[in-house]
Amino acid sequence: MTDVTIKALASEIQTSVDRLIQQFADAGIRKSADDSVTAQEKQTLLTHLNREHGSAPDKLTLQRKTRSTLNIPGTGGKSKSVQIEVRKKRTFVKRDPQEAERLAAEEQAQREAEEQARREAEEAAKREAQLKAEREAAEQAKRELADKAKREAAEKDKVSNQQTDDMTKTAQAEKQRRENEAAELKRKSEEEARRKLEEEARRVAEEARRMAQENEKNWTEAPETPEETTDYHVTTSQHARQAEDDNDREVEGGRGRGRNAKAARPAKKGNKHAESKADREEARAAVRGGKGGKHRKGSALQQGFQKPAQAVNRDVIIGETITVGDLANKMAVKGSQVIKAMMKLGAMATINQVIDQETAQLVAEEMGHKVILRRENELEEAVMSDRDTGAAAEPRAPVVTIMGHVDHGKTSLLDYIRSTKVASGEAGGITQHIGAYHVETDNGMITFLDTPGHAAFTSMRARGAQATDIVVLVVAADDGVMPQTIEAIQHAKAAQVPLVVAVNKIDKPEADLDRVKNELSQYGVMPEEWGGEAQFIPVSAKAGTGIDDLLNAILLQAEVLELKAVRNGMASGAVIESFLDKGRGPVATVLVREGTLHKGDIVLCGFEYGRVRAMRNELGQEVLEAGPSIPVEILGLSGVPAAGDEVTVVRDEKKAREVALYRQGKFREVKLARQQKSKLENMFANMTEGEVHEVNIVLKADVQGSVEAISDSLLKLSTDEVKVKIIGSGVGGITETDATLAAASNAILVGFNVRADASARKVIDAESLDLRYYSVIYHLIDEVKAAMSGMLSPELKQQIIGLAEVRDVFKSPKFGAIAGCMVTEGTIKRHNPIRVLRDNVVIYEGELESLRRFKDDVNEVRNGMECGIGVKNYNDVRVGDMIEVFEIIEIQRTID
């Protein structure tokens, strides 16, 4: 055959040149497109391709599925059909040629060993037969010799007796005895030797026979090969197993492969299950035992449990908190034993009560176990430590919080700085949640936080002070220091934040700057010109006077503080405000402290977590990142976080979810522990207090800060007689769930800047619920006060309506002593309660029984007129006494 090139061969076999070159290379032949190919090289390539692709499969798997229906009896005599499906799988593996050769060699060696053993057994049997024949011949010769010796001895004795008649009978008897003893010893020695030889021959023959039988058995039984794997029918019901057996007999009955046929053959090695229904029944019977109390031998399937001989000491892992029931489970004891141990230690507890780590450690060690204390925030610490926080710190913009009393012009001042109209959008002209803004000035950027000035927003203002670098205290020049001004000073001092005082409304005629300085100096805010540290800047939010000086003072104070932050790396910050938007979901206003917050980052925020889906600045514009001191609104959290929560960017969303769930569980445990503690502490107070009226409220507001402020204000209204109870609160509109909760708890639905949806209004109309909307917190508090006032029991007041002087006393057979009186003040009315005064001391308190004027009964007697008064059940009336008539009136109480 002539040689062809690679190209020609590729076109001939209809494949690409590159693939053919690669196949030659795999076969170990290096060729190019223009090289020629010899017949030998073609044969080499063909052999390689057959070995790679033409080989038969090494393994073949057969699967079979059969279905059947089984009717089983049920309750009430009804039968129930159960669908049974049996799946079988058999795998046949092709032997490797080398493996086949090895198995053949092993079989040949085994046959040779068996043949050698058989020959050795035959030779041993022949030797044993020969030895036996020799022994029998020797014994026969010995017996003949013994008989001959006896006959000769008898003849000698006869001759000797004839020749020696004079021998005595005693000598003959002695000689006979010695001869008998010698013969007996010889016979015993011969029998012992013969017995040993027979036993040795029998043992050798038995061993040879046993080896031959084992070899024959191993030769006749085919060894188990991997060609057929064991099929397991694992069922979970007696009926299913029975149906499986019946189905096998129907399908494979002619071929003898049913389960009962399998049971007749020896069981395969390694089969862990019973091969037939009979085997399973036998195993169950062995476990149950026979009739009449005669139990069979214990089965291997029967579980044997023995009580421990002594107490088992365990390693008990205890977290920061644990319930009594969980502690008992960890120690493998009953909960009552743990409660007894705690009672011995002087602590009372229930099985579901949460106990602290120290108490659990004492109880576990008292019961003899080893305690391993575990910190439950290890996961949280690990997540927080796995953060790229950057290295180099750069200067950042100051975060400035504007504080002050209500209506002192905080928002108007910031409004002028930002050149926008924020104040006009606030209900009632007051700020009701924190606004975060950053403004660009000629000297740099400043971030402003505008906090409400109303007393109800104390917690919001406290959060603002914690997140800020500088506090601008706005004081009206015409109003001076007010309660919220003092509170703002306290917050700033508690947070150790420097103060810059902006004296607003300086353009008013009644403005008095010195008065403001004097009043603030009483609370530790000293002006710089007086030797203090606070800068006083007179400004006017309307005219714009002193605004530039205020900004310069803020930047100067920031320069002194040397504010720096890491710009690169994973961000961290704080939640300034949060609310639930109907279209966007949970929204949180975040102030970034360090790092850069990017869109798509995974954030952990208190009890919530999520991926930042979108970020907007205070103008509502989309941004992709936010650096230090920049406030942004983020979307994508799992829920509405609490205002003031820490915001941290983490790497793994799964771990962030685990930390958030752990925090939720921890908060719940702490809350339950606190409730339990308050129940124990207030036990006697709850036993002694009378009936207390409650005003139940379901509160919904637009932002989280408003919910907190309103809740705090309403809870402070509670008195000993009427208590305000917030049944439910949240952020967002009033839903059907809120209305149902209010109906179940007889509560008032309060919506602050939110409205009820259609489904909620249906429930409200059907249940006739009290729904109220508010946009100003003053109105809400006033109406709740009015509702509480209606629940107060009225105050009873005694009002004196008349006073009469006793001028004379005379007797009446019907009423006893009658006092003749002159009305000196007011009006005396019949059947009213009276007091009898003697020397201005009350000596009797009772009721008027009779009131007459001139013999006529009258209902009242006016001032300056005489009358006769009969006092009920009292006769010790004297001249000069004063009779005071009064009435009890009810005065409706109010909540101050």
From Swiss-Prot:
Location of region: Disordered: 94-307
Record GO terms (molecular function): GTP binding; GTPase activity; guanosine tetraphosphate binding; translation initiation factor activity
Subcellular location: Cytoplasm
tr-type G domain residues: 395-564
Region spans: G4: 504-507
Highest taxon of source: Bacteria
Chief localization: cytoplasm
Entry binding sites for GTP: 404-411, 450-454, 504-507
Chain segments carrying region G2: 429-433
GO cellular component terms, A-Z: cytosol
Ranges for region G3: 450-453
Protein name: Translation initiation factor IF-2
Species of the source: Klebsiella oxytoca
